[in-house]
Protein backbone atom coordinates (compact mmCIF):
# COMPACT_ATOMS: atom_id res chain seq x y z
CA UNK A 1 0.00 0.00 0.00
CA UNK A 2 1.30 3.46 -0.91
CA UNK A 3 1.01 6.48 1.38
CA UNK A 4 1.45 9.89 -0.25
CA UNK A 5 2.28 13.21 1.36
CA UNK A 6 1.89 16.13 -1.04
CA UNK A 7 3.21 19.57 -0.16
CA UNK A 8 0.65 21.79 1.57
CA UNK A 9 -0.36 24.51 -0.88
CA UNK A 10 -2.46 26.69 1.42
CA UNK A 11 -0.71 30.05 1.80
CA UNK A 12 1.25 30.33 5.05
CA UNK A 13 1.05 26.62 5.89
CA UNK A 14 4.42 25.26 7.00
CA UNK A 15 3.37 21.99 8.61
CA UNK A 16 3.61 18.54 7.05
CA UNK A 17 1.41 15.54 7.75
CA UNK A 18 4.15 13.03 8.57
CA UNK A 19 7.58 13.27 10.19
CA UNK A 20 10.60 11.11 9.32
CA UNK A 21 10.11 9.13 12.56
CA UNK A 22 6.62 8.14 11.40
CA UNK A 23 7.90 7.33 7.91
CA UNK A 24 10.42 4.93 9.43
CA UNK A 25 7.64 3.13 11.33
CA UNK A 26 5.45 2.92 8.22
CA UNK A 27 8.29 1.55 6.09
CA UNK A 28 8.97 -1.11 8.77
CA UNK A 29 5.33 -2.16 8.35
CA UNK A 30 5.95 -2.48 4.59
CA UNK A 31 4.16 0.67 3.43
CA UNK A 32 5.69 2.60 0.57
CA UNK A 33 5.85 6.33 1.37
CA UNK A 34 5.97 9.03 -1.32
CA UNK A 35 6.72 12.60 -0.24
CA UNK A 36 6.69 15.63 -2.48
CA UNK A 37 10.08 17.33 -2.64
CA UNK A 38 10.53 20.17 -0.13
CA UNK A 39 7.28 19.34 1.68
CA UNK A 40 9.02 19.50 5.03
CA UNK A 41 11.06 22.64 4.40
CA UNK A 42 8.61 24.88 6.27
CA UNK A 43 9.04 22.63 9.30
CA UNK A 44 12.84 22.55 8.90
CA UNK A 45 12.82 18.92 7.72
CA UNK A 46 14.85 18.33 4.58
CA UNK A 47 14.28 15.70 1.91
CA UNK A 48 17.32 13.70 3.01
CA UNK A 49 15.75 13.11 6.44
CA UNK A 50 12.75 11.53 4.74
CA UNK A 51 14.97 9.53 2.39
CA UNK A 52 17.02 8.25 5.32
CA UNK A 53 13.75 7.11 6.93
CA UNK A 54 12.84 5.18 3.78
CA UNK A 55 10.55 7.54 1.86
CA UNK A 56 10.80 8.17 -1.86
CA UNK A 57 11.00 11.84 -2.83
CA UNK A 58 8.76 12.81 -5.75
CA UNK A 59 8.96 16.13 -7.62
CA UNK A 60 5.38 16.12 -8.90
CA UNK A 61 2.35 16.18 -6.60
CA UNK A 62 0.17 14.78 -9.41
CA UNK A 63 2.20 11.58 -9.32
CA UNK A 64 1.60 11.28 -5.58
CA UNK A 65 -2.16 11.71 -6.00
CA UNK A 66 -2.22 9.19 -8.87
CA UNK A 67 -0.21 6.48 -7.12
CA UNK A 68 -1.08 6.78 -3.43
CA UNK A 69 -3.78 4.67 -1.82
CA UNK A 70 -3.69 6.95 1.22
CA UNK A 71 -3.10 10.72 1.14
CA UNK A 72 -2.01 12.48 4.34
CA UNK A 73 -2.43 16.26 4.54
CA UNK A 74 -2.66 18.82 7.30
CA UNK A 75 -5.36 20.97 5.70
CA UNK A 76 -8.45 19.85 3.81
CA UNK A 77 -7.69 19.53 0.10
CA UNK A 78 -8.35 22.57 -2.05
CA UNK A 79 -10.50 22.06 -5.16
CA UNK A 80 -7.49 21.51 -7.42
CA UNK A 81 -6.15 18.86 -5.03
CA UNK A 82 -9.54 17.22 -4.66
CA UNK A 83 -9.71 16.72 -8.42
CA UNK A 84 -6.39 14.84 -8.28
CA UNK A 85 -7.49 12.39 -5.58
CA UNK A 86 -8.19 9.01 -7.11
CA UNK A 87 -11.46 7.20 -6.51
CA UNK A 88 -11.58 4.66 -3.68
CA UNK A 89 -8.52 6.14 -1.94
CA UNK A 90 -8.24 7.32 1.68
CA UNK A 91 -7.63 10.84 2.95
CA UNK A 92 -6.29 11.70 6.41
CA UNK A 93 -6.46 15.39 7.26
CA UNK A 94 -8.05 18.00 9.49
CA UNK A 95 -11.06 17.83 7.15
CA UNK A 96 -13.43 20.03 9.16
CA UNK A 97 -16.52 18.22 7.84
CA UNK A 98 -18.92 20.39 9.85
CA UNK A 99 -17.64 23.50 8.03
CA UNK A 100 -16.83 21.97 4.65
CA UNK A 101 -20.06 20.28 3.53
CA UNK A 102 -19.22 20.59 -0.17
CA UNK A 103 -15.89 18.88 0.47
CA UNK A 104 -17.68 16.03 2.24
CA UNK A 105 -20.04 15.64 -0.72
CA UNK A 106 -17.14 15.62 -3.19
CA UNK A 107 -15.23 13.05 -1.15
CA UNK A 108 -18.35 10.91 -0.97
CA UNK A 109 -18.96 11.18 -4.74
CA UNK A 110 -15.42 9.93 -5.43
CA UNK A 111 -15.87 7.10 -2.90
CA UNK A 112 -12.94 8.39 -0.87
CA UNK A 113 -12.72 7.32 2.76
CA UNK A 114 -11.97 10.45 4.78
CA UNK A 115 -10.58 10.53 8.30
CA UNK A 116 -10.86 13.90 10.00
CA UNK A 117 -7.98 13.89 12.47
CA UNK A 118 -9.43 16.53 14.77
CA UNK A 119 -12.51 14.35 15.38
CA UNK A 120 -10.57 11.36 16.68
CA UNK A 121 -11.48 11.03 20.37
CA UNK A 122 -8.88 12.28 22.82
CA UNK A 123 -8.78 9.06 24.82
CA UNK A 124 -6.07 6.69 25.98
CA UNK A 125 -7.07 4.16 23.32
CA UNK A 126 -6.67 6.67 20.49
CA UNK A 127 -3.74 8.57 21.99
CA UNK A 128 -1.29 7.65 19.21
CA UNK A 129 -3.62 9.22 16.65
CA UNK A 130 -4.32 12.38 18.68
CA UNK A 131 -3.07 15.04 16.30
CA UNK A 132 -5.26 17.76 17.80
CA UNK A 133 -3.57 17.89 21.22
CA UNK A 134 -0.13 18.57 19.78
CA UNK A 135 -1.47 21.26 17.47
CA UNK A 136 -3.46 23.07 20.18
CA UNK A 137 -0.49 22.84 22.54
CA UNK A 138 1.77 24.53 20.00
CA UNK A 139 -0.90 27.11 19.10
CA UNK A 140 -1.35 28.01 22.78
CA UNK A 141 2.38 28.40 23.31
CA UNK A 142 2.65 30.58 20.22
CA UNK A 143 -0.34 32.69 21.33
CA UNK A 144 1.46 33.54 24.58
CA UNK A 145 4.60 34.57 22.70
CA UNK A 146 2.61 36.69 20.26
CA UNK A 147 0.72 38.32 23.13
CA UNK A 148 3.99 39.06 24.94
CA UNK A 149 5.20 41.00 21.90
CA UNK A 150 2.38 43.52 22.43
CA UNK A 151 3.00 44.18 26.12
CA UNK A 152 4.81 47.41 26.78
CA UNK A 153 6.45 45.96 29.86
CA UNK A 154 9.10 43.35 30.58
CA UNK A 155 7.41 39.95 31.06
CA UNK A 156 9.40 38.12 33.76
CA UNK A 157 10.64 39.36 37.11
CA UNK A 158 14.06 40.92 36.64
CA UNK A 159 16.39 41.35 39.61
CA UNK A 160 19.78 42.92 39.05
CA UNK A 161 22.28 44.95 41.05
CA UNK A 162 20.73 48.03 39.46
CA UNK A 163 17.27 47.21 40.81
CA UNK A 164 14.20 45.09 40.38
CA UNK A 165 11.58 45.18 37.65
CA UNK A 166 8.29 43.59 38.63
CA UNK A 167 6.83 41.08 36.17
CA UNK A 168 3.97 41.99 33.89
CA UNK A 169 0.51 40.88 34.96
CA UNK A 170 -1.54 39.25 32.23
CA UNK A 171 -4.87 37.48 31.98
CA UNK A 172 -5.08 34.55 29.58
CA UNK A 173 -8.59 33.66 28.45
CA UNK A 174 -9.22 30.37 26.71
CA UNK A 175 -8.24 26.75 26.76
CA UNK A 176 -6.69 24.54 24.13
Language-model-detected regions and their locations in the chain:
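An N-terminal-biased, well-structured beta-alpha scaffold segment characteristic
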Residues: 2-112
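Glycine/serine-rich phosphate-binding loop and adjoining beta1-alpha1 elements at the start
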Residues: 2, 79-169, 173
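Active-site donor-nucleotide binding/catalytic segment of nucleotide-sugar enzymes
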Residues: 176
Amino acid sequence: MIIGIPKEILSGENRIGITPVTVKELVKKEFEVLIESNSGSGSFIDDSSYQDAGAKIVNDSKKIYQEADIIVKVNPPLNEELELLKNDSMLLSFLQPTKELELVKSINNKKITGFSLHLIPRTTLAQKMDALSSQTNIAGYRAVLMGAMHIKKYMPLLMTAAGTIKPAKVLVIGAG
